[in-house]
Amino acid sequence: IDGRQLNVTNYVNLLYGDAMSYTIGLAEYEGNTRSFTSTGESIVLDKVEDFQENPIHKNLVLDVGGQKVGYLMYNQFLNEFDDQLIQTFSDFAAEGITDLVLDLRYNGGGSVLTCVYLASMITGQFTGEIFAQQIWNSKLLAYFEALNSNTNDTDDRELNNYFTNTTSEGVTLPALNLSNVYIIATNRSASASELLINGLAPHINVVLIGNTTYGKNVGSITVYDYIDNEGNKNPNHTYAMQPIVLKIANSVGFADYANGLDPDIELRESASNLGVLGSTTEPLLYMALNQITGSGKYLVPQGKVLNPMTDPEFEATNGMHIDLPQNTLKDFLKN
């Protein structure tokens, strides 16, 4: 990086410093000797602030042994991109896919509501059934239960998340009606990614491929300085709070995955086995496709699997948040 050799002690300063551009030297990895050799080539990357990535990084329909397999690499649960996510599943349904590989290897979480939509589109046969249960502290649990009792609301929507066939705006969700899903996950898969895996598990067969997930089974809400009951924010306050306020369980009450969710098939992503994302020869996707076709073949990475470096930005960006009706907590705080 900028003419300096990257190592485990300097990578944070080199990659996460104040520089607005980087010159990155390229190298090839030699599996037999477990070493890198410079190619003499380099690329220049310019830093862009406030850039919002489209979380739908790859969406493909693969013909694998005569079977149509959908592949979606999804990097964050962002409700701003729900329309694109819905369109992706509409395309999958139109193509008549019979299996789905969902790649969450870099997905640190996001909106619970978007997670519910995704789970509902993967399935479709569980509309109205519980997908996830929110476990709040005793005071808020009592408040929500009393609120539902007073309004004769029997489905506890303040506490539970249900499979649905429409969005909150009334948009119809496409459904694949799958009974199996193959999910690629790593230790960077956190929060809403883990909620999706855990929430689907009691309902369909979830085959988890990769390594143990991050282990974040809690959720947060955004607390603004509202100046009225109409949702208008104080223009003088540009910050908000994001407290962790709840734990989320699946429909059978399981929420104890603070140490992560273990894979059914373990295969670590490493510099020793990197492939092209979306390629059928990329090791993790290759393994998922082999589970679908039943070939059972295994790609052995060349050389030792290298331990990944810790990303100091990941702790700040992974998370799971829920969207409550505007007055729900405000009314509680008045009591």
Q: Residue spans of the language-model regions?
A:
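C-terminal, low-ordered peptide segments at domain boundaries
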Residues: Q5-I97
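Terminal peptide-recognition signature
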Residues: I1-D2, I24-G25, L72, L102, ...
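C-terminal "post-core" interaction segments
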Residues: G66-L72, Q76-D99, G108-N335
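Active-site-proximal loop/turn and secondary-structure-junction residues that shape catalytic pockets
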Residues: E49, Y106-G108
